[in-house]
């Protein structure tokens, strides 16, 4: 039993060390760790735990999911704009199109969503899936749903505009 507990402790320590290594890439978190006597990995895990509990128990869940859906992608979008590679620009531009569409649609069905248990937990997971470059969620939604609808709509609009005679310019 003690050997199993020691194995679990080693795995947890390795996991925390990996998180600390990843978080060390961000100067703001390094500065945070120097200012506050809490290791950045523990602070990040604590913040993640509190965020998860709040969303799960629907405490300011709408605000928190929109905060996650805006600030994290906004940060990486700004970084992408400053980088020379166009691929990361595509990732974040696609994310914003999908996120914007879902946010827009959500305003119309908000009354129905109130009755769906764990809606904000599901929404949080969806936002994470959409934004992670590893999952390419936004790209998948865009290419399978939004793009085909857009191309069909665009074609219809162009045909309607082509068949409509131009109005004469007003002269005064």
From Swiss-Prot:
Membrane topology term: Multi-pass membrane protein
A single cellular component GO annotation: endoplasmic reticulum membrane
Segments on the Lumenal face: 60, 108-110
Pfam families cross-referenced by the UniProt entry: TB2_DP1_HVA22
Keywords for this protein: Endoplasmic reticulum, Golgi apparatus, Membrane, Transmembrane, Transmembrane helix
Keyword Endoplasmic reticulum: yes
Compartments reported by the entry: Endoplasmic reticulum membrane; Golgi apparatus membrane
Record-annotated membrane-spanning stretches: 40-59, 61-80, 91-107, 111-129
InterPro entries: TB2_DP1_HVA22
Topology feature Cytoplasmic, residues: 1-39, 81-90, 130-172
Keyword Transmembrane helix: yes
Subunit structure and binding partners: Oligomer.
Function: Required to generate and maintain the structure of the tubular endoplasmic reticulum network and the vacuole. Induces high curvature in membranes and causes membrane tubule formation. Involved in membrane/vesicle trafficking.
Domain remarks in the Swiss-Prot or TrEMBL record: The short lumenal loops between transmembrane domains 1 and 2 and between transmembrane domains 3 and 4 may impart a wedge-like configuration, thus deforming membranes.
Sequence similarity: Belongs to the DP1 family.
PANTHER family on file: HVA22-LIKE PROTEINS, RECEPTOR EXPRESSION-ENHANCING PROTEIN
Protein name: Protein YOP1
Organism: Mycosarcoma maydis
